[in-house]
C-alpha cells in the first residue's frame, strides 16, 4: 500500500474540479490514500517584472521545500519525461518494490517550480507541451495515480 501526497501551488478549487478530485481521492483509499496539500502562491500582479516573478517562484519553492518529507518525490515539469499510463504504473511499482512506499508529487505555480525544488526530486514528469489549468492538473494527476493503482492490482479500469 502506498500513500500519495500531492503538493500543489494555489489555494481552493472550483466546485466541479474539487468534486472530481475528491472522487479519485476516495477511490485511492483502498490503495493507501491520496492527500492534497495546498501551497500558497507567490505574490503576482500580472504585470510583474522578471525579478518579481523570480521572487514569487522562490517563495513558492521555499514553502514547497518546507513540506517535502522523506518520501520519494516527483515533480510535474514541462521538461520532464512523457510517460504513458502503463509506464507510470510500472515506475511507481518499481519504487514501491525498492522500498519507497510513500510517493509525493509536486505541481508548481503559473511560472513553474524553483530550481531547488526540481533538484530535490527523484523524477520529473510531463503531461505534454500543452498548458493546462493548475486546478485541472490536480484532477488529471489524481486520475493517473488511480489508473496506475488499478493497473498494478489488475482492476478492470484501464482500457
Swiss-Prot record:
Keywords: Cytoplasm, Methyltransferase, rRNA processing, S-adenosyl-L-methionine, Transferase. Homodimer. It comes from Magnetococcus marinus (strain ATCC BAA-1437 / JCM 17883 / MC-1). S-adenosyl-L-methionine binds at residues 108, 127-132. It catalyses: pseudouridine(1915) in 23S rRNA + S-adenosyl-L-methionine = N(3)-methylpseudouridine(1915) in 23S rRNA + S-adenosyl-L-homocysteine + H(+). GO terms for cellular component: cytoplasm. Specifically methylates the pseudouridine at position 1915 (m3Psi1915) in 23S rRNA. It is found in: Cytoplasm. PANTHER family: METHYLTRANSFERASE (PTHR33603), RIBOSOMAL RNA LARGE SUBUNIT METHYLTRANSFERASE H (PTHR33603:SF1). It comes from the Bacteria. It is an enzyme of class 2 (transferase). Belongs to the RNA methyltransferase RlmH family. GO terms for molecular function: rRNA (pseudouridine-N3-)-methyltransferase activity. Its EC number is 2.1.1.177. This is Ribosomal RNA large subunit methyltransferase H. InterPro entries: Alpha/beta_knot_MTases, RlmH-like, tRNA_m1G_MTases_N.
